[in-house]
Amino acid sequence: MQTRTPFRATTAATPYDAIRPLPVTILLGNVRSLYNVGSFFRTADAAAIEKLILAGITGYPPQNMISKTALGAEETVPWEHTRQPAQRIAALRTAHYEIAAIETSVHAVDLFDWRPRFPVCILFGHETDGLTPEVAALADTHVRIPMLGLKHSLNVATAGGVVLYELLRKYRNLQA
């Protein structure tokens, strides 16, 4: 029988109704793994983002493999599915969102040097192919995660966590 450690928090540090959403929307373009989609839901809930947009072939709830890694976050994070990511990106741009692609393009700025203009929409692509050229071209900025190892590669859901928490840190510093 497994028991919780006595020092582990079982409730949120801040009441949910007191949390203002982080002005970030994430668009997942053609993310193949439903486990990665579920991980994005869970991290999106932890960072209290505005919305998750699931585009192209990206799977969407209800699906058991999403639920397995989301642990219920698919019920708490606002989300939508679209087959037309370009139209959603255009609507976000009209609403004054900065559109930032997480890519390793030659023009990408380092995540730690990037000064985002909130609100921001972050674009993540397929696990091995990245964003389609058409979607990548719609970004105002390309941002890369600095990597020191030889692979120069992170799992897309892991990359999402890295980027979201750097954005959370930057946003909180702006509010201080």
Where are these regions (language model features)?
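Post-transcriptional modification and biogenesis factors for structured RNAs
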Residues: 1-176
